[in-house]
Amino acid sequence: MDSISTAILLLLLALVCLLLTLSSRDKGKLPPGPRPLSILGNLLLLCSQDMLTSLTKLSKEYGSMYTVHLGPRRVVVLSGYQAVKEALVDQGEEFSGRGDYPAFFNFTKGNGIAFSSGDRWKVLRQFSIQILRNFGMGKRSIEERILEEGSFLLAELRKTEGEPFDPTFVLSRSVSNIICSVLFGSRFDYDDERLLTIIRLINDNFQIMSSPWGELYDIFPSLLDWVPGPHQRIFQNFKCLRDLIAHSVHDHQASLDPRSPRDFIQCFLTKMAEEKEDPLSHFHMDTLLMTTHNLLFGGTKTVSTTLHHAFLALMKYPKVQARVQEEIDLVVGRARLPALKDRAAMPYTDAVIHEVQRFADIIPMNLPHRVTRDTAFRGFLIPKGTDVITLLNTVHYDPSQFLTPQEFNPEHFLDANQSFKKSPAFMPFSAGRRLCLGESLARMELFLYLTAILQSFSLQPLGAPEDIDLTPLSSGLGNLPRPFQLCLRPR
């Protein structure tokens, strides 16, 4: 690009930023925050290598509620359990909008369930929850699917024969098959090219969006669209995933029986047919493709990433692993796989899983929210349409809620009698109106997968347990666990 073109591009960017800044000066009394620079906002204060740490550091200076400018975009940041709970739970309706997330929104155009707002979001969410329940989410039928898939996973793990291996791909394939069976009506063989493509695309995008490139794109999307870098693969990957889903939808249309839909896609197609004469219907091809995309992405990555963190923690703390295995042997034995009915009798295992989720904190900054109306909150007035970042990391590491927040400690979820205890500050699935609709499915998968694996194997690191690093490789959209290999020793 020559110097004249560069100058024109920078001038246009400056004009856009100026217009955005002027348009944001509407009514309202926002909390204080660092003074922004023109165009850059507070970018110089925010270390692009670690946005989370930078925002958390600002909360120590400005308190649990402050205003920050991500480039030209003005955002309110909430930190700590009390502030986040008051927003997402106590005033859930006002904070139920979806904030701007260019890496997702520029692709979904607000058509998917995760990145829509208003009536569209409410209609799609209600419909999706009902269909997922109909197909067994939280019930015995989905438990049977998980147990079946768990058996396939155990067979794959046995093939390692005690040799070192990276569990990333085998875990992702198995976990993804659960949501695939709900969305598409059947599971894939582990060597099926469609499943391998799904895993590759989702893993690549999650990694990019959890990197400095992903964070920078979400601050300056218009500029970064013209800059080469790994962020350019985000939309290429999303398009490939969309095309794969569209091909499956085409096959589903050919075999659709409206009287007996066999999976989520066919239920959605049936609803589309019922409302085809309604010009205001939210059920059309774009919302089907994007909702399926959102469910596939979330249903694949959150559980598999949590299992990766769990493996690392259990290898670093072998006494914790041994105690979980002792509880499995006592309650379940070896003659059958663990079942959900066992969870109530396994408080320590339940506490360990919750502590993994708290400590791993895989979506540390949550997805952005947006206030749906002018909102009075904590003595301030947040104008309608203002984006809000709720730092879930500061909830999960809040010293007022957890005795030793910086340590991996299952006792955080056990009472004096060693019975399981809930914590209101446990928010790995967010909270309030935007609570992840796959929460119950994810909790089932985590319990059934982890107990089945530890019933059959012991996890052994290649080096000393104390050398295992539990800090994330990078933080952005998610906290990425560090790559590792391990050996599985049959029990």
Curated annotation (Swiss-Prot):
GO biological process: epoxygenase P450 pathway; naphthalene catabolic process; response to toxic substance; xenobiotic metabolic process
Record CDD domains: Cyp2F
Catalysed conversion reaction: an organic molecule + reduced [NADPH--hemoprotein reductase] + O2 = an alcohol + oxidized [NADPH--hemoprotein reductase] + H2O + H(+)
Residues that coordinate or bind heme: 436
Superkingdom classification of source: Eukaryota
GO cellular component: cytoplasm; endoplasmic reticulum membrane; intracellular membrane-bounded organelle
SUPFAM superfamilies: Cytochrome P450 (SSF48264)
One GO molecular-function entry: monooxygenase activity
Protein name, entry field: Cytochrome P450 2F1
Species of the source: Homo sapiens
Gene from which the chain derives: CYP2F1
